[in-house]
């Protein structure tokens, strides 16, 4: 497919509207809304360290797990606060799948189009992050879990602004998720696989090179079995690392510690 399919209007005003902010221990947490793509507004948090910068930046994109209280932009609040103490600015965004009923509302007939729109929204989020005072575009980490990891790969394959990626429990192909529901059979399933193949992360992850990638997987993940995870990792170019945890799809505190240390090294952050 033509990369022009991913075009978006990066010159459109972000129309940032502050909601509130609070400061403690030299760190400011701001809440805002902004103009995403396709006439949608999204909510976000920004963690700002004290000082004038330049600040390394991190874009956090949450997972989808309707039963989990952190299946939204709050997922990485504690991690982002810790990163601010290390000198990094972070943006934590609302997504299409912040709606807990999103998966059941969607259909295979619309998944390709909606996926293109999601990539455009992630690019707008990057615009917002890099528009923050003091943001350093040369030290930019992308952190995504589940759909956040998968769509982050597609985004990075067409817009290489992040300088490193931490990809958490992503599965290599969108039909791995989207064929769960609603049920379709036979030729419809194969036609859907062919349509989504143009977006599948496993065929786009090599496009993130030369940015370093950390892949994180749980050995007991019912959605991302070991063979899928290993195939995803194998498709990426160097530099890359893979880390396994005795956990399910939500990963673990050990995974968070590993990820923080890895980002700290790649963004050249200071210890808190």
Give the ranges of each region predicted by the language model.
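Short beta-strand/loop motif that positions the catalytic acidic residue
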Residues: 208-209, 214-217
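Primarily recognizes the serine-hydrolase "nucleophile elbow" in alpha/beta-hydrolase
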Residues: 123-183, 187
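Short alpha-helix in the alpha/beta-hydrolase fold that links the catalytic acid
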Residues: 225-233
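Acidic catalytic loop of the alpha/beta-hydrolase fold
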Residues: 219-224, 250
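Short beta-strand element of the alpha/beta-hydrolase
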Residues: 44, 54-65
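C-terminal catalytic histidine-bearing segment of alpha/beta-hydrolase fold enzymes
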Residues: 234-272
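N-terminal cap/lid segment of alpha/beta-hydrolase-fold proteins
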Residues: 9-52
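Cap/lid segment of the alpha/beta-hydrolase catalytic domain
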Residues: 64-120, 176-180
């Amino acid at each position: 497919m033509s990369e022009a399919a991913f075009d978006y209007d990066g010159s459109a005003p972000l129309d940032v509207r502050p909601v509130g902010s609070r400061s403690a221990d030299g760190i400011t947490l701001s809440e805002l809304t902004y103009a995403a793509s396709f006439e949608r507004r999204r909510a976000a948090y920004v963690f700002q360290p004290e000082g004038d910068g330049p600040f390394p930046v991190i874009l956090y994109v949450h997972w989808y797990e309707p039963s989990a209280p952190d299946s939204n932009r709050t997922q990485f609040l504690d991690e982002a606060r810790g990163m601010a103490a290390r000198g990094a600015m972070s943006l934590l965004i609302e997504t299409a799948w912040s709606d807990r009923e999103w998966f059941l509302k969607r259909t295979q007939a619309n998944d390709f189009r909606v996926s293109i729109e999601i990539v455009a929204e992630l690019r707008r989020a990057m615009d917002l992050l890099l528009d923050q005072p003091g943001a350093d575009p040369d030290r930019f980490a992308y952190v995504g879990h589940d759909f956040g990891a998968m769509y982050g790969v597609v985004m990075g394959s067409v817009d290489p602004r992040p300088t490193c990626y931490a990809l958490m429990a992503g599965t290599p192909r969108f039909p791995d998720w989207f064929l769960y529901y609603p049920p379709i059979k036979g030729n419809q399933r194969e036609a859907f696989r062919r349509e989504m193949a143009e977006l599948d992360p496993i065929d786009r992850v090599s496009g993130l090179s030369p940015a370093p990638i950390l892949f994180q997987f749980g050995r007991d993940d019912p959605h991302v079995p070991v063979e899928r995870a290993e195939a995803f990792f194998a498709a990426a170019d160097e530099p890359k690392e893979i880390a396994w945890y005795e956990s399910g799809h939500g990963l673990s505190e050990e995974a968070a510690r590993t990820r923080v240390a890895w980002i700290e090294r790649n963004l050249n952050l200071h210890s808190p």
